[in-house]
Amino acid sequence: MSNQRFASVWDAIEDTPEEAENMKLRSVLLTALKNYLTRTEMSQAQAAKIFGVTQPRVSDLMRGKINLFGLDALVNMATAAGLHIEMRVLEAA
């Protein structure tokens, strides 16, 4: 058994570095959206109207079903919520 260390859980469980990076970005966005909804005490129905999605879709978001959301969808919802997204790109070590 190897004692390999990973910088992120996504590095450990995803098959490729590309998939891991995608999941890292998606998890940051999903968490930001969940925090926004919790902080504003907005109902799922209200959020659905703002995000332009269905209430069950917001429920999936709140339950952390990350596999159901692509980057585009999460970016669109965050922007609709008035959140500003910044991205930083670094060269691999």
Task: Locate each region found by the language model.
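N-terminal flexible/basic segments that precede or flank functional cores
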Residues: 1-32
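DNA major-groove recognition helix of helix-turn-helix
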Residues: 62
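Short, charged recognition helix plus adjacent turn
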Residues: 89-93
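Short amphipathic helical patch at the helix-1/turn junction of helix-turn-helix
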Residues: 37-39
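Generic structural marker for isolated residues within well-ordered, non-membrane alpha-helices
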Residues: 33, 44, 74
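DNA major-groove recognition helix of helix-turn-helix/homeodomain DNA-binding modules
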Residues: 71-87
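Short alpha-helical DNA-recognition segment
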Residues: 42-57
